[in-house]
Regions:
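Extracytoplasmic/periplasmic solute-binding protein
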Residues: 1-41
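Short helix-initiation/N-cap motifs at beta->coil->alpha
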Residues: 67-82
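Long, aromatic- and glycine/proline-rich binding clefts that accommodate carbohydrate-like moieties
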Residues: 109, 161-195
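Glycine-centered hinge/linker elements that transmit conformational signals in sensory
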Residues: 27-70
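Beta->alpha turn/N-cap motifs
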Residues: 74, 90-96, 124-126
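Paired acidic/hydrophobic, glycine-rich loop segments that form the ligand-binding mouth/hinge
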Residues: 87-92, 107
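Extracytoplasmic/periplasmic substrate-recognition and gating elements
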Residues: 100-168
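Hydrophobic residues within well-ordered alpha-helices
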Residues: 10-13, 79-84
Length: 195
């Protein structure tokens, strides 16, 4: 993976421990951690995170991850994959298409968990923050909600999708077809094992 970028370490940590982070304890921790009304500083708990870091440590040992790996960017990783120096890389369905178009046999795999579950990382995610002052001005709140409704609409989401790039929608009223590049993880998506 392109560990040069700080988000890759977090995505790897989360991907390796998606089942724990999606458990009752994991959801409870995430809810408390991200609650804007929580005035108590919330750190890593002693239930979910020790296992997550143990798994990350095992991953580092198993893969032989070194300081040199931490300095590689996305282009370095792509070049190594194209020249058969890497067996796997962390990417998207668009990457699968790109490599298949180059004649490289590539498939999309989920993160395999110790409990037998399979999960896929859904990044980048769509996150929105609305200013609490909107509750004081109904006209502005309605305008903000109209923008949000438009962004979450089926039309807007279908415009995002382009040849070989998938979009997994959390909106139940949006029907998006997966490209052939995610066919191998369709059961994982149908089980809603997306983190």
């Amino acid at each position: 993976a392109d560990y040069y970028y700080d988000y890759t370490c977090m995505e790897t940590l989360q991907g390796l421990s998606a089942s724990e982070l999606s458990s009752v304890d994991g959801r409870k921790w995430r809810t408390t951690y991200s609650d804007p009304d929580n005035t108590k500083r919330e750190g890593l708990d002693s239930t979910v995170w020790p296992k997550a870091f143990e798994r990350m440590e095992q991953f580092i040992q198993d893969t032989g991850l070194s300081q040199d790996d931490l300095d590689m960017n996305y282009d370095d990783i792509v070049e190594m994959y194209q020249s058969n120096k890497l067996a796997m890389y962390f990417g998207s369905s668009a990457g699968v298409k790109m490599f298949q178009d180059q004649g490289i046999n590539t498939t999309f795999l989920p993160f395999f968990q110790e409990n037998g579950e399979k999960w896929i990382m859904t990044t980048p995610y769509f996150q929105v923050a609305l200013n609490s002052n909107l509750t004081k001005d109904e006209t502005r709140r309605k305008k903000a909600m109209k923008v949000l409704d438009t962004m979450l609409s089926a039309d807007a989401q279908n415009r995002i999708v382009y040849d070989g790039q998938d979009l997994l929608s959390y909106s139940q009223d949006v029907d998006l077809q997966l490209t052939e590049y995610l066919k191998d993880v369709k059961p994982v998506i149908e089980e809603n094992h997306m983190y």
